Amino acid sequence: MKWVTFISLLFLFSSAYSRGVFRREAHKSEIAHRFNDVGEEHFIGLVLITFSQYLQKCPYEEHAKLVKEVTDLAKACVADESAANCDKSLHDIFGDKICALPSLRDTYGDVADCCEKKEPERNECFLHHKDDKPDLPPFARPEADVLCKAFHDDEKAFFGHYLYEVARRHPYFYAPELLYYAQKYKAILTECCEAADKGACLTPKLDALEGKSLISAAQERLRCASIQKFGDRAYKAWALVRLSQRFPKADFTDISKIVTDLTKVHKECCHGDLLECADDRADLAKYMCEHQETISSHLKECCDKPILEKAHCIYGLHNDETPAGLPAVAEEFVEDKDVCKNYEEAKDLFLGKFLYEYSRRHPDYSVVLLLRLGKAYEATLKKCCATDDPHACYAKVLDEFQPLVDEPKNLVKQNCELYEQLGDYNFQNALLVRYTKKVPQVSTPTLVEISRSLGKVGSKCCKHPEAERLPCVEDYLSVVLNRLCVLHEKTPVSEKVTKCCSESLVDRRPCFSALGPDETYVPKEFNAETFTFHADICTLPETERKIKKQTALVELVKHKPHATNDQLKTVVGEFTALLDKCCSAEDKEACFAVEGPKLVESSKATLG
């Protein structure tokens, strides 16, 4: 993704643009400094998240012990910065605690080998061993009365367990945001545990909170993957576009400065430096509030809130109105006689300014689409500025963007029409079939997970007004496809997936969309056991029952990748009828024993 190097100078061209927010005096004790800055409550939470994200299998009690040891050290260092171990880096402090665990080798295997390395290589090694799909049971929410009793009995331990359980399942969860969600969780419990019907109060509120927190986790995973796989500049390019859309009245200098500082914040959190990340995030929010008159009047609604809510509020702000009377982009970037001169003298700055100007005028475009346009503009200038008549060569460059714009617009139109025709569940099934045919080598659980997530784009985005659909759809799909890429990178099985995931961050979605059925795939043998069901399926919650049916659908496609939609629809219909019949029978198991083999035979006959 070489094109994103054009952002480099943009964030380096003047130290004035990055002065102020993160310029701190050197501290004798880093841990004392961070403890003082973030406060004891947030310090304890961030240390717990740090250990939970590194050591995903350890019991909570073991983490609580480590957190106490680190907190006691921090307090000792606040009292006397010259005390023993107070001059250690935070990586040294956390890494030494991890490496001192007697059970490290037995529980984590190769992670123990990291302890033979010195910092910073040791921390990089720990990061490499974070598991995006840990072998942990699904998080089960207790009954309302049990939940409220645990909350009232020991509030501190209750929220410690919450941070621990979420962090170890999501090792890249944006730590300051996880503290925010814990705060929201507390507010819900405080209200609902006093209600007459606790369950009726808790369930919808906790469902909504869980949904938002899962999206937040996936968004941060994309940021971290972007930084880890494509470098800081890839994230800076993304942030430049998004902030230019959100704050179109802010000037280029302000946007550049915020981008630089925001990149530092996310790089720290992605690198496991959660105390620094939370501290710097608070400083950035403070800076933006101090300069709200030049950035956005919308900031006013956020800036009087406590720090966790303030930063969350700023992140969630809607786009400002585009300023009236902006000149056409073509004036500076096509018609100006010095386009090539400006480009060649300061390529990064000039192209960064182009992205800023184009993005602030197009809140109706997705971030990745705008980055594709930046890529196309750069390629045109690179070619044309080497010719005898550059202007004649690049005069139509903005018109040449149209196919790049039309492609995602058509994708959104077609898929939203399909969603409206099929509804949630059947739309997911259509995507299941589509993606199983594209990349049948991917494991069935991953295909089910990803296709269900892709299918949610319908309910999430298709009901939006036309102007909001494209950014909603494409930016959501970027997050979901990143999950596929992250899981596939650990256990690669498909060259097509590797290619789409590795070549270009902004072209991932078009790459996957362009994939046709894999004609090289050797179909799986028919396994009757895969399609054999028992009475226990009848007692499963509706969501889990749907997942069982979708798992069977993926296996059908892997067995018969050339099956028509009508054939698959027939088999799925027969399967649904079997469930309805046997789950209504008096002797459910006997029904499945008799009717199940009939389904297997009829399915084989239907599919040929």
Curated annotation (Swiss-Prot):
Modified residues (Phosphoserine): 29, 82, 89, 297, 443, 513
Binding site for Ca(2+) 2: 37, 279, 283
Binding locations of Ca(2+) 1: 30, 268, 273, 276
SUPFAM superfamilies associated with the record: Serum albumin-like
GO cellular component: blood microparticle; cytoplasm; protein-containing complex
Disulfide bond positions: 77-86, 99-115, 114-125, 148-193, 192-201, 224-270, 269-277, 289-303, 302-313, 340-385, 384-393, 416-462, 461-472, 485-501, 500-511, 538-583, 582-591
A GO biological process held by the record: negative regulation of mitochondrial depolarization
Sequence positions bearing N6-methyllysine: 558
Expression across tissues: Plasma.
Signal sequence region: 1-18
Binding site for Zn(2+): 91, 271, 273
Protein location: Secreted
Keywords (A to Z) from UniProt: Calcium, Cleavage on pair of basic residues, Copper, Disulfide bond, Lipid-binding, Metal-binding, Methylation, Phosphoprotein, Repeat, Secreted, Signal, Zinc
Posttranslational mods: Phosphorylated by FAM20C in the extracellular medium.
UniProt GO molecular function: DNA binding; enterobactin binding; fatty acid binding; metal ion binding; pyridoxal phosphate binding; toxic substance binding
Positions where N6-succinyllysine occurs in the chain: 229, 460, 588
Subunit structure of this chain's protein: Interacts with FCGRT; this interaction regulates ALB homeostasis. Interacts with TASOR. In plasma, occurs in a covalently-linked complex with chromophore-bound alpha-1-microglobulin; this interaction does not prevent fatty acid binding to ALB.
Family assignment from sequence similarity: Belongs to the ALB/AFP/VDB family.
Role played: Binds water, Ca(2+), Na(+), K(+), fatty acids, hormones, bilirubin and drugs. Its main function is the regulation of the colloidal osmotic pressure of blood. Major zinc transporter in plasma, typically binds about 80% of all plasma zinc. Major calcium and magnesium transporter in plasma, binds approximately 45% of circulating calcium and magnesium in plasma. Potentially has more than two calcium-binding sites and might additionally bind calcium in a non-specific manner.
The protein's name in its UniProt record: Albumin
Organism encoding this protein: Oryctolagus cuniculus (Rabbit)
